[in-house]
Amino acid sequence: VITRTGDPMNPNDLGRVNLSNAKSIIVLDSDDSGDATVVSIVLAVKAVNTNPNLKIIAELDDANTAEALSTATNGQVIAVRSHDVIARVTAQASRQPGLAAVTLDLLDFDGDEIYFQDVPALTGKTYRDALLAFNDASVIGLVHANGNTELNPKHTTKIGAGARVIAVAEDDDKVVYTGVSDVVANKKIPTPKAFTRKAEHLLVIGWSSMGRSVLTE
């Protein structure tokens, strides 16, 4: 880990870190200054950056600011509303026991993780084919050549040139194309049972800025 001291809103200081050669840039929200500082830093980064493919991930609070910043930079800035994400995960974890453990397992390096992999052999095939094409990985979605991401799209979705698969695997070297299988499980597909929604009773103790988002979720 190499650190540098300086003002992230000062282009001269940013020039010392050779940011154009970075894979991506993360701009964190300061606890006391909020979105205004994040926006200023992003603008300073764009003024110095010479790499048009560089992605900037910015932590923001306000939804309107996040959308405006992403639109103004033609998608180069990926806005992450961290408090909103935490609130939504908190709400879902309270309703679905075990979800928190699954989320942590996917985000840390102890278990399986999510990987994005180029698989030219799948070009022209369908998402259904992709589901059956990996022995040691589970495909969960696609990233199309235009950058659009689809999680669990329709099985008939065609995989175009330049698309990548999103897969859950033990390591990136486990996401290996093993060929499209024609084997279909010779089992009777069970008829889904009718689902009746029941009232849930949850207790919220205390309150914070995330409270409204938790209740909405």
Regions found by a protein language model. Give the residues of each.
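Cytosolic regulatory regions of ion transport systems
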Residues: 1-217
